[in-house]
Amino acid sequence: MSNGPDQSLKNRVRERAKLAIRGGLHRLDLDVSKGVYTRQVARTLAARGDDTVLDIGANVGQYGLGLRRSGYDGRIISCEPLSGAYAELERRAHRDPHWHPVNAAVGREPGEVDIHVAANSYSSSILEMTQAHLDGAPDSAYVAVERVAVTTVAEVVERFGVDPARTLLKIDTQGYEAEVLAGAGDLLGTFDALQLEVSFVELYEGQQLAEQTIAVLREHGYRLQSLETGFSDPSGRLLQADVLVVRDH
């Protein structure tokens, strides 16, 4: 694949076109926003008095938009590294005074990193994709690489004056969840709730699997609140799920 200026421009145009199509599907309620589960998350936030959401791996803002449509009116801080996805996220957030977009990846430490851009945008990852992922989602192959800035959960908390005890930390980073948690440092056990996408099969090379991730969360005092199954391979084997964990008050 050529990395010249013409190819780079074509890749950006291709990504923006796909994002525009997804935006249209969202308006027709056909987007991948997982509306029913998002409403359940919003109810949990309301019941627990949480007024801030750190949306790590925001893509085009479908998670934040789903929360708003579900009645959540607190602060949302959405981090998205890819330029094309971030442009759509920024467009959605700019009229909402309590929705703050951040153009950066989130990881173990600040810096820069190359991220692989997937054909479907939302499967993009810092990690290499495995064949198991491609078999389960053939439209997710990588088509480009983009250099992006990296921040940490701890930095975002400090920058925005976040109170972790009233905050949901949501992480959807395509296999990079363990690195995001590492970047939270000592804050990990202080967030009131966490929502993560976990994998039962290695979909990205070197990623932490669901069993270990859930064990780490339990060690930090979290219990399972709810779970939504994600996508499966052609045989019906479950590959991913979203889990919501909370601290006991």
Indicate where each model-derived feature is located:
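Phosphate/nucleotide-binding beta-alpha loop and adjacent structural elements of enzyme active sites
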Residues: 2-249
